[in-house]
Amino acid sequence: QYQIALFIDAEETERLEISLDLLEKLVLDEDLVGFEGIGFVIQAYQRRAPFVIDYVIDLAKRANNRIMVRLVKGAYWDSEIKRAQVDGQLDYPVYTRKFHTDLSYLACAKKMLGAQGQIYPAFATHNAYSLAAIYTIAEDKEFEFQCLYGMGETLYNNVVGAEHLGLACRVYAPVGTYETLLAYLVRRLLENGANSSFVHQLVDPEIPIEELVVNPVELVRKTAGASNPYFNKPLAIYPGNRVNSKGLDLSDELQLAELDTELNQYFAKVYTAEPLLWDYKVSEREAKQVRNPAKQNDVVGFVSNATLAEVDVAVSNALRAFPEWSATTPQERAARIIKFANLMELNYYEMLHIVVREAGKTLSNGIAEVREAVDFCRYYAAQVANEFDNATHQAIGPVVCI
């Protein structure tokens, strides 16, 4: 009714796809046909930013409407890096070098400016070089700049107005209570207080102007596009040869589709669990049925509990094997534990399937369960290999666990 624009803001990476789903619903809603006030925020530090722009352009074409897009560099970098490490992702969803983000920002800006019929571009920046580059790229195209209240006045006083560049700048001011705004203000402090921040460097008299306005293309060429050498991939964050346990990103629709396909192949499988004894034939007995606690008509498998006689056999076998095993080097023991961990990860989906079906765990809890088992094996194997010696660390002998 009042043609007030509304932007869907950008937050952590795992919320991007659900935000795009919401954008699609709104843009294609029949009640909003012709309304050009629907906006979306895209973060240039995300590696998939250019492809998100392609998606928004395609969506605008399908809706025969124009979508407002605000391009920012991104304010959750620290948490994105940490989350990727904690979740055991294959790689980081964001760039690990600041100048890669700066270059991505300019590349995304050029792509947005080239889609005037589908996108109304808005560039949120306090970086003088980014501003000048966009002004040069844009020529006579329609767009606006944006800045935060209290931060961009010095820069944009030289941009706004007919006596300057004659460009529009929308000023963003946070509104709300202390409790609501605290997290927002902390993010702004972290973002602009970082040593690599343009705002931070601008007030530093030790930084020459030539270094302040360096072309990010030159920096990327100097490093041949390589990632930050101080950042190992998420699976290689631990010292030595210890590998982080692999996780799954449940916010990624492609990974969800693959997970669904992998898990479905095991639903028809019925498992049998019984005592496993060396040189001893387990007697036949009535097995106990195990059902899925979340779906009672789903029989997961059958369990045959050990008898007292079989426990005696297991203990006897362990006692017979103990002298040879206790003489095995810690490195060999660690290698076997590592192999066990690798085999669990090789059978990742089936392990997850069993945890979900037998214990009734959610997918996220099941993934954490499998990862914990793998990680414990690798953690203690590393300790055994590096810190144990048969001359100083004596085994306590066979132990029966119930």
Regions found by a protein language model. Name each.
Residues 3-7, 38, 92-95, 115-120, ...:
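Glycine- and acidic
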Residues 14-15, 45-48, 306, 343-344, ...:
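Glycine-/small-residue-rich active-site loops that bind phosphorylated ligands and cofactors
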Residues 60, 138, 322-326, 344:
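Hydrophobic residues in alpha-helical segments
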